[in-house]
């Protein structure tokens, strides 16, 4: 990834994108043979080889070695640039988001104006920062990263640079709620990756995630879950753990939406067990917390929700859950709804639906808001969001009848399907808010303790336990 000679940097970057670690090491040895003084260059290429192999433990050890070796030498600044780049990838892979900020800030501060590595590495770092920003719903930062990428003066027009820019562009469009456009960019980027053999560290996991979210937004749940499974497989293979847990959470949510709460909480429990078994430090515990929060809100477990809300980052869903718990407690303020942001399509549709629900007793007002929301849904592909507004189905149907189009008639059909699905769930005794005793049982089930032990602890018979289940 480092270019000892200016003409070689594109070739070296392709080696890195294609996981050709042996060739990187051989190139480093060739550099050393041509010029025995270029020890630092050879060592950095060896570090990058560890990195593109996704051997992050080996890469971290190599970072320590070469930082120690070249401290207080003429090569120290160059080595520091290379190791901060490496640590950015390592910290992201391990989900160390706090340390990731430190390594990225150092790299950007020391390489933005006078890069010590070639400029493609600058875009690489920005892509990592964009991925972290998307995971944490830091959408303003994500947008500024993309702006910096497209304004950055690069020295060549190679496909791998376009690939980096497209990765972030797709994420930005998704953050805006422009799922149709985001999916188009992500699909093209996936094709670039296939055509050029980009794997390992540069695998198109972020673009696949955008495609999965776009499918989910379009109410294509089966397609979305298939992509999420592919992401989990690829993330495991290349040790990209944030992506694994982000994708896994949607399996839990899918079970929860089907009222399969035991299965949903079992996935959350397995996530926590997997994280606890890692032999490296990380900042990923918030992901199963978020996944559990989603399950808890469906059963109105306000007490457990509050515990989770107190310890998770302030993601978009977290803000929505806080507002929901206030509503359940009888706190409804029109000021809160009217002050909701509405710059992007994602923000606009959420605000319109929220206002439609607030004015549900004033039907004509609610229908007008919902009609506007449906127009945005058609253009952006935010179908599933509308289909999950169970309390507003009557308002949605009246909005559809206001001015039926092909899309709105399609939405009417999907609403009817959801009503039938909900009726089927109700015939099975779901979804009814759980009693306090049932909630207590569910809380214990999420800990992984055997049912017999829970029965004994709560002084509940096994038959009663089965009834609660």
Q: Would you name each region that the model predicts?
A:
Residues 2-6, 34-45, 73-86, 113-128, ...:
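Alpha-solenoid helical repeat architecture
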Residues 422-468:
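Helix-turn-helix DNA-binding segment
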Residues 1-71, 90-102, 133-140, 144, ...:
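Inter-helical turn/loop elements of alpha-helical hairpins
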Residues 62, 126-133, 145, 162-173, ...:
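TPR/Sel1-like alpha-solenoid repeat signature
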Residues 115, 197, 279, 300, ...:
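Short coil/turn linking the two alpha-helices of tandem helical-hairpin repeats
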Residues 352-419:
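General nucleic-acid-binding
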Residues 24, 31, 59, 65-66, ...:
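Tetratricopeptide repeat
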């Amino acid at each position: 990834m480092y270019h000892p000679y200016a003409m070689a940097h594109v070739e070296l970057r392709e080696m890195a994108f294609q996981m050709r670690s042996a060739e990187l090491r051989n190139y480093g040895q060739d550099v050393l043979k041509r010029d025995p003084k270029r020890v630092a260059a050879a060592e950095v290429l060896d570090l990058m080889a560890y990195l593109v192999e996704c051997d992050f433990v080996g890469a971290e050890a190599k970072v320590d070695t070469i930082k120690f070796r070249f401290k207080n030498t003429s090569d120290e600044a160059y080595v520091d640039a290379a190791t901060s780049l490496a640590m950015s990838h390592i910290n992201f892979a391990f989900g160390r988001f706090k340390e990731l900020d430190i390594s990225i800030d150092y790299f950007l501060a020391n390489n933005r104006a006078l890069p010590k590595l070639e400029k493609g590495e600058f875009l690489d770092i920005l892509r990592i920062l964009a991925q972290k920003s998307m995971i944490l719903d830091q959408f303003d930062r994500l947008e500024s990263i993309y702006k910096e990428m497209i304004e950055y003066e690069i020295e060549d027009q190679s496909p791998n640079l376009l690939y980096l820019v497209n990765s972030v562009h797709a994420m930005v469009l998704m953050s805006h709620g422009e799922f149709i456009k985001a999916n188009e960019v992500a699909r093209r980027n996936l094709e670039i990756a296939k055509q050029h053999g980009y794997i390992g560290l540069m695998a198109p996991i972020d673009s696949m995630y955008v495609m999965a979210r776009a499918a989910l937004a379009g109410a294509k749940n089966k397609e979305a879950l298939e992509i999420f499974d592919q992401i989990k497989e690829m993330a495991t293979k290349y040790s990209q753990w944030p992506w694994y847990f982000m994708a896994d959470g949607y399996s839990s949510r899918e079970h929860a939406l089907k009222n399969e709460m035991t299965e949903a909480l079992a996935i959350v429990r397995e996530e926590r067990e997997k994280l606890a078994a890692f032999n490296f430090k990380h900042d990923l515990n918030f992901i199963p917390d978020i996944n559990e929060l989603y399950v808890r809100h469906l059963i109105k477990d306000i007490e457990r929700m509050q515990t989770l809300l107190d310890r998770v980052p302030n993601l978009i869903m977290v803000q929505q859950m806080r507002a929901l718990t206030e509503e359940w407690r009888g706190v409804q303020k029109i000021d809160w709804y009217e002050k909701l942001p509405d710059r992007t399509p994602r923000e606009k549709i959420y605000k319109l639906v929220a206002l439609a629900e607030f004015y549900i007793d004033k039907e004509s007002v609610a229908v007008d808001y919902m009609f506007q929301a449906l127009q945005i849904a058609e253009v952006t592909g935010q179908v599933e969001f509308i289909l999950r507004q169970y309390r507003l189905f009557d308002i949605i149907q009246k909005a559809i009848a206001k001015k039926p189009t092909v899309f709105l008639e399609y939405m009417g059909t999907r609403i009817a399907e959801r009503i039938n699905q909900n009726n089927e769930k109700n015939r099975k005794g779901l979804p009814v808010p759980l009693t306090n005793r049932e909630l207590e049982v569910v809380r214990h089930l999420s800990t992984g303790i055997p049912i017999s032990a829970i029965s004994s602890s709560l002084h509940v018979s096994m038959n009663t336990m089965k009834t609660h289940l």
